[in-house]
């Protein structure tokens, strides 16, 4: 039996899809699609908030000079180091994350108990990935050909597992392999 219930799951999927669509469109209005290489959604372990961020080649090139060579592959994919994201754009753009999605997560959090937390967490994560996937399917493939999509978990021991799992669900196999090997590759 579902912890969240079908209504909350569908509402979360629809709003995540809408949020990704609107924010990615905004990113593409500011940056050339060939310049954008990463777009991520990030959430905390307790599923209490969801944010977004996108990175560009030129931003990474500027950022990486501030780090030793061995750290550069990590900052390339670390969303706080990304070019643009939640809180850095007009409120109208972030509104779906700050209002609609936040309200859904607030309501969903009232359903958590000690006995159902892992199932609750899995349902939230799966719904986010499903909404993300719906959005990507509706974006012009020419504009996403260089972009790797993934979900990250903030300050969690499971971050890399979620990032790899979501990248596999959201990208072509080639893009997934590139992402999976991101820390072994040259910056």
Q: What is each model feature region?
A:
Residues 2-36:
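Short N-terminal edge-element motif at the start of the domain
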Residues 23-34, 108-111, 135, 139-142:
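Short secondary-structure junctions and interdomain/linker hinges
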Residues 26, 30-68:
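N-terminal interaction modules that seed assembly of large macromolecular complexes
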Residues 41, 46-57, 77-84, 145-161:
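Generic preference for hydrophobic/aromatic residues in regular secondary structure cores
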Residues 45, 67-71, 169, 176:
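Intrinsically disordered, low-complexity regions enriched in Ser/Pro/Gly/Gln/His and often acidic
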Residues 60-121, 125:
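Polybasic, proline/glycine-rich intrinsically disordered low-complexity segments
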Residues 125-133:
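Extended, Lys/Arg-enriched charged tracts that mediate electrostatic binding to polyanionic substrates
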Residues 134-187:
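Glycine-rich, aromatic-bearing surface loops/beta-hairpins
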């Amino acid at each position: 039996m579902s912890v969240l219930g079908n209504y909350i799951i569908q509402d979360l999927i629809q709003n995540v899809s809408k949020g990704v669509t609107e924010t990615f469109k905004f990113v593409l209005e500011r940056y050339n699609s060939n310049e954008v290489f990463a777009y991520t959604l990030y959430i905390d372990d307790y599923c209490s908030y969801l944010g977004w961020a996108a990175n560009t080649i030129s931003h990474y090139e500027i950022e990486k000079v501030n780090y030793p060579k061995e750290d550069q592959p990590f900052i390339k994919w670390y969303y706080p180091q990304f070019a643009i994201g939640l809180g850095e754009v007009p409120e109208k753009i972030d509104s779906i994350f700050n209002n609609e999605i936040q309200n859904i997560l607030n309501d969903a959090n009232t359903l958590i108990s000690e006995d159902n937390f892992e199932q609750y967490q899995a349902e939230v994560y799966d719904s986010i990935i499903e909404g993300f996937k719906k959005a990507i399917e509706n974006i012009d493939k020419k504009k996403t050909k260089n972009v790797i999509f993934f979900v990250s978990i903030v300050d969690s021991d499971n971050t890399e597992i979620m990032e790899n799992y979501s990248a596999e669900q959201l990208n072509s196999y080639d893009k997934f392999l590139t992402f999976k090997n991101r820390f072994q590759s040259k910056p």
